[in-house]
């Protein structure tokens, strides 16, 4: 089986983006040659793959011979000799003498690509771990391969020197690997790999607006000019299949209870049969049908859970560069953005649309969402203007959502004319509602005009290629109440790093800490003595420090701000009497980018740990002090005993588990833990600066009772990216290897900052699985996006598998549902065969691997047989294409 190389999926379509960019370049007068590029995204991607690609399993001698670019060995050696000596030696050590062995023919390095006049389209070279899997265990700072260096040197070198002579390069797809090559975090030297590879070639980088951290990485380490782009279309998940049938049956149950009690036992049995058919008894922790006395409580719980799943915001497709949403997509995106209170001028300026509607009817949206199964008598003013069941808080949410949609559809129909707001509100609700009108007025004057300017994405990409100034703008998640990050098409900036955490983030962080401790107390009856928290730079920038605030709150500290600058100047310890609980020991696994971007925050957290450890408090009031004392008794080194912040080797990035999972060479938790420790066993803090500290990391991790990762946006979820399973799942696997027992794994949800929740990792996985992964709405949306949509399906399966391998969160029934939805559904199967047969093979291969490894413990024999048949058919199809 092949070793697939996956990058994190972009939330845009690079193939279609390239088609649009080609058309815009041609219109602007660029020479695209005599043969025009394909005008279809799938056709372009298929042509690029046919030209060679990087999958050695399917690469043929004919493709190598016909490669667009051929770099003679002597030419490459001349370029290689210009690389600083230290990097040259490291490349020789790992990749041999130039030109190496990767993608070579007859001593030449070959590059797969498509050339259209003065424009060339290439696939970024592979990072190299798939080709050198032993490096996964030992070399997180693996240098680029000869092939990698050659590709960028060929782009840069003039034709007289054997190169293409590019004046600029555009990276399409978020994100690439160039900016993550080893070297300094900023202020790069000549021997830092990104600088050695890219040189002074201008880089223009369309990048999603909600990812300030990774975009900033490209700015800092690859001198990129970012042109930000919009988030994907969003929609409410709704119910489907057995979930929709259950909703109807619950309504029928309420009716027969009131009007025909004799039928109650029959309907109860039908409800339970459907619950079992949908595998919902796992979600609801009910293995047997509740008895008659408890069934009504079970129904309330079920109703509330269905409401929670259907109310999730999911992606309803992928963003297409410069495609301004209109019609139904704009209605859905406006509803998603208006769900959160709006932050304007650094303060909360307007309530969310649903929040304003709820208040107008004497309800509280947060209370409804907190107890969706609660029986309620809804106000007649609400039930008179919108039809639907009206017996529970979940019903109230549905009615309010329906009203919100009618309001937004009404405005969409009238072209968002500002002077129609009051009339639309009165027509839909039957009476004036000033607060609701204010939200719609804001949408008409600020949100929609900014969405209309999404076309700036292409205009400013071309402007950057013309050497023109790309206007700056803020970054963040629009659906978190940040309309000011729109319009897109700007060169985004992030945050003042010394203002982390902000006052608003402190409030959210305290809520996250309180929610986590309350959930653990409810689950176990006690407080956790030690918590492990994963902290990323992107999240810190997007939220202005929610995670940092949570760490401080768990320790029993709080920030001190300068009122004028809003910067954090230090921390203070909260007295135990005010805290009202023990101080929790916190171990933090930071990302490499966080290390680079927030060194002063690392110092702030380190100061907090050391101050709390030095407090004269009883062990049962200060778990951190107790643990530090135990370590001091063992080795006597205070600096080692108080090390609680661990991350990547200086100059390196990542957690290492993605290449390990993709290489398929791991066998047990010991392998997962080994890579996690090799890639993350470096201590940070005052006087540490990335000191190798594996033993101290393992000692700290062995105490972790709770492993936490927070999720601050619904624009993506925990199986949308490999980083979640690498960092969070990796932490779980590490603790399990060290102790023999998995820690409690939780996900903090602050996507709505005013309504923070904590779920177990299993609960969050099932919620995402039902709301998005096997939701026909999402699958159909991906089918609209061809090759890239199919890639998203395959990536989702990969990331679920990765989380299962590390944290054990995928049940057998979930694998069965994946196979049924992605491979056995005729429409989706045909889509994969036509648009991306490589994704079809990859999905099948991954599911078979899950069964082979016992992660999918007891697959149905018929399912396995169909998977094997699918795999063989897919192999044959791909062989026919070669």
Where do the PLM segments sit?
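Ligand/cofactor-recognition surfaces for anionic moieties
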Residues: 2-882
